Amino acid sequence: PLETIIPVTSINMVRQLCCLLESMLPGEGEEEIRDAEVLESLFIFCVIWSFGGALVDDSMLKFDQFVKRLANWVVIDAPGRYAKAGQLPGTSPTLYEFEFNVKEGQWIPWSQKIQGYEIPMNTPFNQIIVPTIDTARNQFILDHVVLKCKQPIMFVGRSGTAKTATINNFLSSFDQDRFMTRTFNFSNCTTSMDVQLSLDDNFDYPTKDTATPQGGKEMVVFIDDVNMPTVDTYGTQQPIALLKLLIDRGGMYDRGGDLIWKSVQKVFYITAMAPPGGARAVLDPRFTSLFNIFHVVSPSDESLHHIFNTILGTHVKNFSDEIQHIFKTVTDATITFYNDVVAKLPPTPSKFHYLFNLRDLSRVFEGLCKST
């Protein structure tokens, strides 16, 4: 059986499929798609990111093979040649590496969206986002689910997979005249009252029982580490119960003595979290079922080399030729060392602190970027 990063119901996958199809099919007043093969290719692309969007790495490979076998289309694996509608691309291992472009009627590698990027000089290290295949497709998913469908979305992935950075980059691109954003960083001390009071600060009340974002704008709420709040005596995470009420019922009760119901309008939700374990609780399935859920995979070695070669290469641009000739070797050696540490030093009961992730690797390169 296929394994998902967190439990996902069948009906949730179908709802996610409908959301993606709705966001990619022509809207009212736009030209209809009349080519059956274009529609079928679009459907396959949406199936990959709905039924297969929350799968773990190994299951993604199995699901990809199943979809290809089920479609039984010609596979195009010639370098430099794109597969068209009615064909499947084979130049990369899986369909997860491709976007089906409806206008052009062909499968385009995500890698085509990340070429020619240069880091602006003097950018703080923690604000550098080097585009990769992963960030390109996550940005695409955010655009379609949040902006076009206006549905809640949840990114789940290990620490250091750039979930927060990708979402913050997405939020920073918004039209400030149309949208306002609010970010919550949940912890084990977060309470439902904290969340409600913070939201209240950003609302106008055109009537006593209706809340809308200030200035007539739409509001996108980003909740990071959503599974961190403490589970109470009754097995409930109170901030999660409040969010479930907001998303499912579209409102919340006033905390005053009258307990007036307030309808909350024009608010959309993005959440991110690492898989449950340690201080991270298992979320209520009734809460997660409200979201479009996507697994943010760990970057491949190829992506890691691209990221850190770009960062280090920018830093040593004005260094001597000797340094510029060896910086790629330094990147290769550091990534190899990191992979060896992860493989050979797993956490054990006596060494439970042996938890290494990509943030540790980033700290090494942050130190290298302080060299003069």
Language model region names:
Residues 161, 227-231, 278, 293:
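Residues immediately C-terminal
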Residues 196, 284, 301-312, 331, ...:
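An amphipathic alpha-helix signature
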Residues 1, 172, 176-183, 265, ...:
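A short helix-turn-beta junction within AAA+ P-loop NTPase domains corresponding to the substrate/partner-engaging
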Residues 1, 142, 195, 199, ...:
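Conserved RecA-like P-loop NTPase ATPase core
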Residues 1-219, 312, 339-342, 366-372:
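AAA+ P-loop NTPase catalytic core
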Residues 41, 142, 332, 336, ...:
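The conserved phosphate-sensing helix
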Residues 226-228, 321-332, 343-356:
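A short helix-loop-helix "switch/interaction" segment in the helical subdomain of ASCE P-loop NTPases
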Residues 147, 196-207, 222-264, 268-270, ...:
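Conserved catalytic/switch belt of AAA+ P-loop NTPases
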